[in-house]
Amino acid sequence: MKQPITADDISRDLIHFIAKSPSTFHAVRGIKAALLYAGFTEIREEDTWQIEKGGKYVVTRNGSALMAFTVPQEGAEAFHITASHCDSPTFKIKENPEIADGPYVKLNVEGYGGMIMSTWLDRPLSVAGRLLVTENGHLAEKLVAIDGTMLVIPSVAIHMDRSVNQHKEWKVQKDMLPLYGMTGAKTPFMDVIAAAAKVKAEDILAHDLILYSRVPGTIWGEEREFISSPKLDDLQCAFACFRGFTQGQKEKYISVYALFDNEEVGSATSQGAGSTFLANTLERLARSLGYSYDETMAMIARSFMISADNAHSVHPNHPEYADPVNRPVINGGIVIKYSAAQKYATNAFSAAYFKKLCKDHDIPTQTFTNHSDNPGGSTLGNISNTVIAMPTVDIGLPQLAMHSSYETAGVKDTAYLVDAVTKFYE
């Protein structure tokens, strides 16, 4: 007899997914491969679409954002959408990356997103991303991930800097350049990258390469209630929404799984939530099915989107940073996020819709608002709604140390979101 899938099982699968997703390009490639294995058909934005009833499709943009959708056999009335993002704060490797400085060779990097910089010090790091190369006279894309510790960003010993444990302003160009090797004793960095990608260094025309932490994810705690890992924001939600999307029985609605890039730097890119990617996808698939423009706009107005991006749990050592009343806790359930400043898309209707969905299936929810003297951040829902408006709830899973290189969340919460998304698509 087949054993039921437990929250622990789901978290182990999440850790595996994160380990296989060192860059946004790898995350999208992995999800696309899983969808193709499940019978989805890949379509391209540059081609004319021929969407069929009963079909399952996946399309990518820039190799770092993805839309997947399923079409019912009859009577699609609206779209049911989940949106999450696959990027996380990190360091991007600049062009001409090597800096020889005395006896050492460092890599020239710049910050991507609002990270807790000190958490990147003294960690085993490596490099992942994509290369654009010439291959048989044409441009070709190659993904690369160095499977081994390649770099460390060393901290300064306390004997040399007595202020190291005081609040400190970290400068990327001075403090955060990763150590690559000793002058004259290392293979050039781009030669190592080329060898890993099985191309010649002289054939590399451009690259999108980032650093990633090689510290593995783990499940821990007296009752194995915690999960700690790099990139929980937002691969935890991306994974849970994907699993719910593939599990839910899809009838009546066109079900859409949206995975965006560049949320951590504002989403205002061609592959971000502020782009036309979602709007173009919905309109093109509806028009291909024979819906008029007016019918398509009516479908969108009847639709609903769950924007899933992780939320802040109340901190065990610093509860004063949380709202006095709305204080999510790890393993307390899915967090519904509110903002009077409209940093989140949640309103009374969308909150009630999502609460009822969860209540009907015994899935716990919590509420989050920022401390009134702390403006907080924004996320996908309100940004996407400026391009394609529909009722949207901004939700997330409670976590600690958001934007650290190693974050902590709850084992039960991932399972709660899988369950909620599955029921949403049903």
What residue spans do the PLM features occupy?
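N-terminal hydrophobic/helix-forming segments and targeting peptides
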Residues: 1-426
